[in-house]
Regions:
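Membrane-interfacial loop-to-transmembrane-helix junctions in polytopic alpha-helical membrane proteins
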Residues: 2, 6, 59-66, 111
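Transmembrane alpha-helices and immediately adjacent membrane-cytoplasm interface residues
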Residues: 48-91
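Short, Lys/Arg-enriched, disordered terminal segments
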Residues: 1-9, 251-252
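Short hydrophobic alpha-helical membrane-anchoring segments
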Residues: 20-28, 78-86, 248
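A structural signal for short, hydrophobic/glycine-enriched beta-strand patches
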Residues: 68, 80-239
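Membrane-embedded alpha-helical segments of integral membrane proteins
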Residues: 6-55
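Hydrophobic alpha-helical transmembrane segments of polytopic
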Residues: 10-13, 67-74, 239
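A transmembrane-helix-recognition feature enriched in membrane-embedded lipid enzymes
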Residues: 234-252
Length: 252
């Protein structure tokens, strides 16, 4: 009897959790026609969870129970980290008396124009720059294959068109990752004697890992979190969880 009840409970919970993971993983492709590592992992995990009731029936109770415990532990850790990252981006918002240095983290561009995600980041950076007229901004992003100009140049053009003076904007156009965004921007900050109070203009899911990298270089990070397009944030939180493991555990 206990085995039957356990089977029903685990099967139902696993199916619901699996459907949620599948939705998170498939949403970027279904809505925007693309995918990424976080979405792929969420999709695979979702399939495994949905398949759990079938595996439970075919495997001995003890093995199925251990599989469930392992799945529950991984899910809890991942969910906890994702929740903490989301809270961090809102509790560490910029509130400064002195003008900071704003770093805009690059993202996809197409035909010399920013994607919706990148435009949202730039609009958030514009808000900070408008609030602090003496603040400088580093736009950070290299050249995407097939594009006529770097992400940094696209971002600079966008901000200038919105009214930000070109001499307030410094371009970092060599980076290909978040770590390089901040590493190469650090060199620009030191070379130009800019403020070491750093406001990161990026999506909320990006803020925690970016802040940890900024701290590694002795700077003080603050958040200016932009809104993520509908349906993208959950899968990107999964990607950030994986990136945190890679950056601070595997590469440590």
């Amino acid at each position: 009897m206990n085995g039957i009840l356990l089977s029903i409970f685990l099967g139902g919970f696993s199916t619901i959790a699996g459907i949620l993971f599948l939705f998170v993983g498939l949403a970027p492709f279904m809505i925007y026609g693309f995918s990424h590592i976080g979405a792929i992992v969420a999709t695979i995990f979702g399939f495994l969870l949905v398949a759990f009731p079938i595996l439970y029936k075919k495997k001995p109770l003890k093995i199925a129970k251990y599989l469930w415990i392992f799945t529950a532990i991984i899910s809890t850790i991942a969910a906890g980290f994702c929740y903490y990252m989301s809270i961090f981006s809102y509790t560490n918002q910029y509130k400064l008396e002195e003008p900071p240095t704003v770093i805009v983290l690059g993202c996809q561009v197409k035909n010399g124009m920013p994607s919706v995600t990148l435009a949202n980041r730039l609009n958030k950076a514009y808000e900070v720059l408008a609030k602090y007229p003496e603040a400088n901004c580093i736009v950070s992003g290299g050249l995407t294959p097939g594009e006529p100009m770097s992400e940094a140049q696209v971002m600079s053009n966008y901000l200038v068109e919105k009214g930000i003076a070109a001499d307030r904007i410094l371009l970092e156009d060599k980076s290909t990752s978040t770590s390089e965004n901040i590493l190469f921007s650090k060199d620009i900050i030191i070379k130009n004697n800019l403020s070491q109070n750093i406001v990161i203009a990026s999506d909320g899911y990006h803020q925690f890992r970016s802040a940890q990298i900024v701290k590694q270089y002795g700077f003080t990070p603050y958040c200016a979190s932009s809104k993520s397009p509908t349906g993208l944030a959950p899968s990107y939180y999964v990607r950030e969880f994986l990136a945190l493991i890679y950056t601070f555990v595997l590469k440590a």
